[in-house]
Design a protein with these regions (language model features):
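Soluble catalytic domains of membrane acyltransferases
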Residues: 18-176
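N-terminal membrane-anchoring alpha-helices
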Residues: 1-21
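A general boundary/transition motif marking the beginning of the first structured unit of a protein
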Residues: 3-4, 161, 179
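Conserved small/polar residues in nucleotide/adenosyl-binding loops
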Residues: 177-185
């Protein structure tokens, strides 16, 4: 079940890439082999699912909003892959979900993929939205490293008001240092 995400993500990438003309270059991909860990990335649009498919590490799960369960096909594949869903409208439930995930990650040697902005930015400039705290609370709770992954701004390729133009996209995994974090966030 834990390899479902990898198979679906890679299949989606190799099927979609020629249709939309997207060439993805991943820098420092070897950083994504570290497990268990928390991968955080910037979230621009649904195009992120394409490049994520190219770089999706084996034994990885995604943290997503509960509403994704109801998106046709995507929701079913995410559920089958053992991904984790949080109810963003119910803080107590979201905290309970995050508290339970750490032991599961260690037991199964998993990487958790989180977009800490919590939503897609759709920005024409290479800016980030404010981060939600979940990924960082999880890092403190589990003492797992955070691996930042940065995708260049691709507004020049895709603006939600225009047709996707295709092109080259650079994504980089950033080196991390495993720090001993304080046990309170």
């Amino acid at each position: 079940r834990l390899h479902t995400n990898f198979v679906v993500a890679r299949s989606f990438f190799y099927f979609t890439r020629p249709l939309i003309g997207l060439d993805v270059t991943i820098e420092n991909e070897h950083y994504l082999q570290n497990r268990p860990a928390i991968m955080v990335g910037n979230h621009q649009s649904m195009v992120d699912t394409v490049y994520l498919g190219r770089m999706f590490p084996t034994s990885s799960i995604i943290l997503g909003k509960k509403e994704l369960l109801y998106v046709p096909f995507l929701g079913q594949f995410m559920w089958l892959g053992g991904n984790v869903f949080v109810d963003r409208k119910n803080r107590a439930s979201a905290i309970k979900t995050m508290d339970s995930i750490g032991a599961y990650m260690r037991k199964n040697n998993l990487m958790m993929i989180i977009y800490p902005e919590g939503t897609r930015s759709h920005l024409a400039t290479p800016d980030l939205l404010p981060f939600k705290k979940g990924a960082f609370h999880l890092a403190v709770q589990t003492q797992l490293p955070i691996i930042p992954v940065v995708c260049e701004n691709y507004y020049r390729l895709y603006d939600s008001k225009t047709r996707f133009e295709g092109g080259r996209l650079r994504v980089a995994a950033v080196s991390y240092t495993h720090l001993t974090l304080p046990t309170k966030a």
